Amino acid sequence: MSTLLFDKIVFGPIHSRRLGVSLGMNLLPTDGKVCSFDCIYCECGFNKDRKAQRRMPTREEVSESLRERLTQMQADGVTPDVITFAGNGEPTLHPDFEYIISDTIVTRDALCPKAKIAVLSNATQLHKESVCRALNRVDDNILKIDSVLDSRIRQIDRPHASGFGFAQLLEQLKRFDGNLMIQTMFLKGDVDGQSVNN
């Protein structure tokens, strides 16, 4: 499986069919993957093969990188439609995630006020109040559900937390009172000799 890792904090912009001109944000190390899932389809590769050795960027490094890139884009006459947190794994694992979202809102409001802020998350950190507060502040809170069957979640997403399952996830999703989008990867095929069809 070919893999893709982002080598910067801010990457792009890329043209997304769904989001438009998207400026990517990677809050994770640039040399590997940090994730609470080990999805069979992950573009970043499998966790064991892509283990990060470097540290996560600091809140200050993220803020400075975003401000520099948006300033350069302004000079080039390019405006992003969205600032998208994705990157080399699960962005909500960054210990300063809530503060980084706050900083991003301030920077966005100053330099590109029409741009939305989106977070692509696997929803494993919703038990943390700080993560929920931050996700409730972004424009596009995009959370993942690949299956409602725990057996399929274990097969497709391969969560690190043995107790992670759909019932718990559903209760946590209800707390957003509709302020979310669900993202699903539909699969059909064989993985390690087992049929996968969600």
Task: Enumerate the language-model features and the residues they cover.
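Structural motif
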Residues: G20-S22, C39, P80, D140, ...
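Short glycine-centered, acidic/aromatic-flanked micro-motifs in structured strand/loop junctions
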Residues: L27, F85-G87, T184-F186
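Short Fe-S-cluster ligation motifs
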Residues: E64-A86
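Auxiliary Fe-S-binding modules of radical SAM enzymes
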Residues: M1-R18, E64-R67, T71, Q194-N198
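Canonical Radical SAM [4Fe-4S] cluster-binding loop centered on the CxxxCxxC motif
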Residues: R18-E61
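Conserved AdoMet/S-adenosylmethionine-binding subsite of the radical SAM
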Residues: L93-N198
